[in-house]
Regions:
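Transmembrane beta-strands of outer-membrane beta-barrel pores
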Residues: 15-21, 44-50, 71, 83-89, ...
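Residues that define the transmembrane beta-barrel architecture of outer-membrane proteins
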Residues: 22-26, 30, 59-65, 92-96, ...
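Outer membrane beta-barrel transmembrane domains
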Residues: 153-186, 190-198, 204-206
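Outer-membrane beta-barrel domain signature
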Residues: 15-21, 27, 52-58, 84-89, ...
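Short glycine/proline- and aromatic-enriched beta-strand/turn motifs that initiate or cap beta-hairpins
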Residues: 5-55, 60-62
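Detector for outer-membrane/organellar transmembrane beta-barrel domains
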Residues: 74-80, 91-165
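Repeated loop/turn-to-beta-strand initiation elements of outer-membrane beta-barrel proteins
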Residues: 9-11, 36-42, 72-81, 106-112, ...
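Outer-membrane beta-barrel "beta-signal"
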Residues: 144, 179, 183-184, 209-223
């Protein structure tokens, strides 16, 4: 999903539904940014069900801690090294990343990010061996402030397994595309809607390789 970034303490509540997997999601997130460049967040995400592929843990309920630091290169370019720590019933995953951001103008921002997801735990691969389902992940970002009230964002993602695993689309790689529209209702309240196309990664009643759409509604509060 597209991150909602601010330089104040923020509480974000979001609900979602995946049409292919027939799964409902609830996420609660607290984040804070500091003027010295540091940013951090803590979130918990719960599902009413999980995917049926034992090697695909994306549908598990989880908790996530993230932190990053912005390095200003000049008035338009910035680097953002960060670390994501993700834990669920399956185990713990670390995701170090580096993001490059460019402000085209005050209303338009572009970004690219590389993240390496390292699983502390092991899973059963396609050959029946115990291995780590580590991933390479590339993200692209476009954020555009339409006017004082509306902001639109697009995030595109490609990720690949490092080892001998497949996603629910029966491939070693998969894609995601997320589109978000935010409405600044007031200084402290910003509701938003989000649509994601998650490739053919749906799984339901023992079937996978199902076209997956995600529909989300949320609201962000500056505290």
């Amino acid at each position: 999903a597209v991150p909602l970034t601010s330089y104040a303490l923020t509480f974000d509540a979001r609900g979602g539904y995946r049409s292919g997997s027939h799964a409902y999601e609830t996420r609660l997130k607290v984040s804070n940014g500091w003027e010295n460049g540091w940013w951090g967040s803590l979130e918990t995400d719960s599902w009413n069900g999980v995917h049926n592929n034992s090697n695909e843990v994306i549908g598990l309920s989880y908790n996530e801690l993230e932190t990053n630091y912005t390095i200003k290169l000049d008035d338009k370019w910035s680097l953002k090294p960060g670390m994501l720590t993700h834990w669920s019933k399956a185990g713990t995953r670390f995701g170090p990343y580096l993001k490059l951001s460019y402000d085209v103008n005050p209303d338009l921002n572009l970004g690219i990010r590389y993240r390496y997801d390292y699983n502390v735990y092991r899973s059963t691969d396609l050959d029946g061996n115990n291995a780590r389902a580590n991933q390479h992940r590339w993200d692209g970002y476009v954020t555009y402030r339409i006017n004082d009230l509306f902001t639109a964002a697009w995030q595109t993602t490609v990720y690949t397994y490092q080892n001998d695993f497949h996603y629910n689309n029966h491939k070693k790689w998969a894609t995601e595309n997320a589109f978000v529209l935010l409405y600044k209702m007031s200084k402290n309240i910003t509701p938003y809607i989000e649509y994601d196309y998650l490739d053919r990664q749906g799984a339901y009643n023992g079937r996978d390789n199902i076209s997956e759409n995600s529909y989300r509604v949320g609201v962000s509060f500056n505290l």
